[in-house]
């Protein structure tokens, strides 16, 4: 007989039962215990907080840095008739106030919040009156300074706990070393240690490192010899475009994705890839978080990530359906040189950081003692041209200044426009002095979007252009005019990065960069760089075991995955024997039924692996259910 958790799972998600440690985590947080769940990518983290929250009174607050994931999960919850909202950088004060009031007086079950919003006075004032069931911390490794993706804003969560002392916390992450596991619990003020961990082993995912000086040719070769959806990760935005163009010329359908693209373009490309209209997504690390696509057969890293944590998380997007998939790292000596150079690029000297802070004030014309709370649009190219800086070093300096508490730097703001009608539908029909063009825009909005009279709705201005037969500038000015007349509330899209001062501006020489922000993190970053280099160069230990060991799982030789490049190479003597026997069977050049291979008494997985390689090397070809060797 199903219990209440299983009933909710079946009713809202249609799954018959829980997987792995999902139930353990659910029951732990439902008992009011602070809980840390370690689950690999695709392990079903969201179920562990969404299910128990529906059995409790009050709002489940979900802290996550991933705006795209927030929007996606809120959309999915609303589609299941579960009330959910999200607050993140870029919303107007009016929008935030409406959401918080609904949490106090309405029936909202989930409130997704970006960590930056936790410190705002408005949020903290309203939070005191919100009935909270429990707090979920997604990407919990971000709170640890030992982690590869530390975010200072996550430290605000501990202060929120002080405001809600009886409310338990559920922390979730897909990547955490033993040190990070310990630190997460300390930083979140766990009453006692309480960790549930799934093995990070992915038995269907073959980790491969290919050493090559011609990565592009190798990449094309791999994709030509395999089938199915693929992701290729590259470090630079320019490189993603170039590689997508190269693949298309080779007859492999591909597109590219990075944080600098218009949000509408990103949405379209992501949707086309998810619907298999495009086979290959070439992307920076801006792509992948919260992407719900289980049948990715190939993940290729053409550039080395900065850490094994980042590599493991990105590689883990392959084979989430449990079917065979590959994670391939293309590597050569220049990668090691580039990675070691990244250390100084990521941690420029402190005097340079102070100079950047001083020049920001000149650039924005902010006097000493002023600026707190002010936000400025920031064009990094213009800033670098003005002061003769390299953008990479400036970007690093700004992130260190942010971690040191001087500024908030948002280099990838949400780019979609939003509107809400301020008058009722009946009053709208009674409006006078509405021009023909204004009427066409209003009609376009009403026909293509729902909920405009009750909530802020994201709109696609290019769609309104098409249906109203106006250009973008005309649509924009009409929306601005309707907003000025209080018919609608129009929030234009904002694509330009911005910087906010989080404290009054100081003289540059007074800026203090804390040891834990520079010295400690540089040491950690260096260790992360060395770990990925070591992984790429170690061709004697099973790839899966190397990764599991890094994340604190004890393994033995019997735990070798059997499918990574290291394990396959260890089987070479047997592999050569299998190849010889297959070729001997096919030596007459005639078509043979594929079932004839069953007479060769070898392990089925070993046979499958050898056959894949033989096809890739054109040693035989397949015609229906026949195989032919052309001597």
Where do the model's predicted regions map?
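Amphipathic alpha-helical interaction elements
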Residues: 14, 224, 599-602, 612
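C-terminal accessory/connector segments of nucleic-acid motor ATPases
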Residues: 349-504, 510-610, 617-630
